[in-house]
């Protein structure tokens, strides 16, 4: 099926009947998958003026394998057209949107490039969005590398809302949130994560999603926890897109002026 951060969030917002216009920005190949994505967005009423189809490179795709008993997933990703997404593909002046969401950092080769001044192109895209009056939001991808600390921090001063899972939070902050079973210990470690990442520059909220629930913290020190909804196992087909679904719901609430308790 179609997927990825931008597509999933747009479609989730469509299903949530978001009372505002949705816009897609990105690159797809001039192939079956690219045509299907653009057509589906159009059918959903999404503005595709900045969703460009380019020749001679395939649409990005991911093969996901999932262990049914544990839910553990392995991703095989081909970057394709996403690898060419660059600063000049974003024109914030023609957009009427309120929030700009960029995902996933660490999967967008040109935007992840570090420039001579030590900043990534993604950081400049986010800065430009802020200058045009947008609220900014980003999501990361889980990978086993040291790139979290070399690529992500320079973008965070231009980010209002940061979404990440427990693995990504661990990699970015250096505080281990993995396989923590004691709720009190998890709360304590999340507080440490928030302190580290806020020092990197996030302006508003950091939101960590985890199988047990969501931890969120505002720069002013407010902290929230929302437990997960426990569904019967037979109702769970898979976890793909779960983080994007959470982000879509939270972004809908932010757009409509809800407090974070209601968003979560």
Regions found by a protein language model. Name each.
Residues 17, 176, 254:
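Active-site catalytic pocket residues across diverse enzymes, especially alpha/beta-hydrolases
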Residues 202-205, 230-264:
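Conserved post-catalytic alpha-helical subdomain immediately downstream of the catalytic base
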Residues 13, 165, 243:
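Short, conserved phosphate/pyrophosphate- and ester-handling motifs at nucleotide-, phospho-/glycolipid
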């Amino acid at each position: 099926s179609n997927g990825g951060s931008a597509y999933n969030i747009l479609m989730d917002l469509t299903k949530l009947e978001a009372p505002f216009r949705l816009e897609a920005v990105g690159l797809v190949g001039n192939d079956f998958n690219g045509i299907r994505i653009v057509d589906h967005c159009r059918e959903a009423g999404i503005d595709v003026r900045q969703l460009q189809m380019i020749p001679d490179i395939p649409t990005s795709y991911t093969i996901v394998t999932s262990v049914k008993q544990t839910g553990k997933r392995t991703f095989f990703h081909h970057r394709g057209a996403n690898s060419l997404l660059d600063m000049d593909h974003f024109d914030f002046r023609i957009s009427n949107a309120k929030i700009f969401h960029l995902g996933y950092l660490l999967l967008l080769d040109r935007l992840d490039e570090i420039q001579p001044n030590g900043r990534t192109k993604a950081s400049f895209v986010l800065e430009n969005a802020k200058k045009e009056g947008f609220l900014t939001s980003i999501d990361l991808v889980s990978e086993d590398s040291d790139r979290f600390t070399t690529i992500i921090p320079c973008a965070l001063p231009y980010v209002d809302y940061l979404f990440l899972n427990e693995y990504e939070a661990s990699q970015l902050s250096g505080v281990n949130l993995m396989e923590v079973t004691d709720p009190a210990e998890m709360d304590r470690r999340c507080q440490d994560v928030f302190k580290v990442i806020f020092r990197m520059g996030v302006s508003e909220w950091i939101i960590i999603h985890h199988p047990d629930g969501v931890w969120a913290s505002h720069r002013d020190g407010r902290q929230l926890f929302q437990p997960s909804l426990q569904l019967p196992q037979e109702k769970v087909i898979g976890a793909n897109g779960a983080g994007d679904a959470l982000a879509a719901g939270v972004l809908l609430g932010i757009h409509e002026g809800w407090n974070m308790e209601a968003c979560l």
